Design a protein with these regions (language model features):
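A ligand-binding cleft/hinge motif common to bilobed small-molecule-binding domains
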Residues: 91, 108-116, 161-164, 185-218
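Short helix-initiation/N-cap motifs at beta->coil->alpha
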Residues: 27-29, 82-94, 137, 157, ...
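Extracytoplasmic small-molecule ligand-binding "clamshell" domains
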Residues: 24-104
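Ligand-binding clefts/hinges and TM-proximal coupling segments of bilobed small-molecule sensing domains
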Residues: 19-26, 35-36, 159-174, 207-215, ...
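Periplasmic-binding protein-like
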Residues: 46, 125-133, 196, 200-243, ...
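Flexible hinge/capping segments at coil-to-helix
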Residues: 33-35, 133-150, 229
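Extended ligand-binding regions for polar small-molecule ligands
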Residues: 19, 24-25, 65-66, 70-74, ...
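Acidic, polar ligand-binding/catalytic clefts
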Residues: 69, 73, 81-144, 210, ...
Length: 261
């Protein structure tokens, strides 16, 4: 995780350095580029049901994908003017700074560390850290993981909160949630620690695992952007869309569609 942040900081500094030289001849913003292209490029996950996944037809589905379509409609006049780019928790920031996407809508929570290299919209959902175990497990709370092994997904916020709450836990990291889930099932660790909404998606599909009831944090999900003045106009536009869709009840209806509380 530290290597990823160091690399992104370097990329950001290089971009900022180049930007200073171009200020006198270019005032192009990220929103200008989107409007000119007439397509919104959005990074979404495919392994985090019910937020981001492929449906039976192989199409991008979930709350995050639905929000991305709403943003495309608000910016470009049509929810079909969006191109989805699959991302994972470990590669989403790299894809943003490489220019593969204009924004990330992928269960990404706001943290002080991330705010050093990213700008965020206003939150569109609040999750909480939780624990998923095999049924019949002796683990009944986060603290029961002392002296045991827990699984996290690289790029998520789980490792930080887990080490703080359970100093003597052994941590196994995986790149994707399917890999983490498989590791739990075959007994490579005692639990997965992650956002409750993501873990609930796994538990709903398999009655051999269960989600423990307690939540250990608040994780505000927001749309993520490249840090810098080029993103400011785009962020304002997205914030306005989120505010409108929140007040008119559309975001709540989408949450209910996907069984999200």
């Amino acid at each position: 995780m530290k290597k990823i942040f160091a690399m992104l900081m370097l990329i950001m500094l290089v971009c900022c350095g180049c930007g200073k030289k171009l200020d006198e001849v270019s005032t192009t913003t990220d929103l200008d580029n989107i409007m000119k292209r007439d397509v919104l490029l959005v990074g979404v996950k495919t392994d985090t049901y019910p937020f981001g996944y492929y449906d039976q037809k192989g199409s991008f589905s979930g709350y995050d994908a639905a929000l991305a379509r709403i943003i495309a409609r608000g910016l470009l006049g049509s929810d079909k003017k969006v191109k989805f780019v699959p991302v994972t928790a470990s590669d989403r920031m790299m894809k943003l700074y490489s220019g593969d996407v204009d924004m990330i809508v992928a269960t990404m929570s706001i943290t002080p560390k991330r705010q050093e290299i990213l700008d965020f919209s206003t939150p569109y959902y609040t999750a909480g850290q939780a624990v998923l175990v095999r049924k019949g497990s002796s683990v009944k709370s986060l603290r029961d993981l002392n002296g045991k092994k827990a699984i996290i997904v690289f790029g998520s916020t789980s490792e930080r909160s887990l080490r703080s709450a359970v100093p003597n836990v052994g941590i196994r990291g995986y790149k994707t949630y399917p890999e983490a889930y498989k590791a739990l099932k075959i007994g490579r660790a005692d639990a997965i620690v992650s956002d409750d909404t993501i873990l609930l998606g796994l538990a709903l599909k398999d009655d051999s695992v269960e989600l423990l009831p307690k939540r250990y944090s608040k994780e505000p999900y927001a749309v993520a952007f490249r840090k810098g003045k080029e993103s400011k106009e785009l962020i304002r536009a997205v914030n306005n869309i989120i505010e409108i869709e929140t007040h008119n009840g559309n975001l709540r209806k989408i949450q209910e569609t996907y069984g999200i509380k």
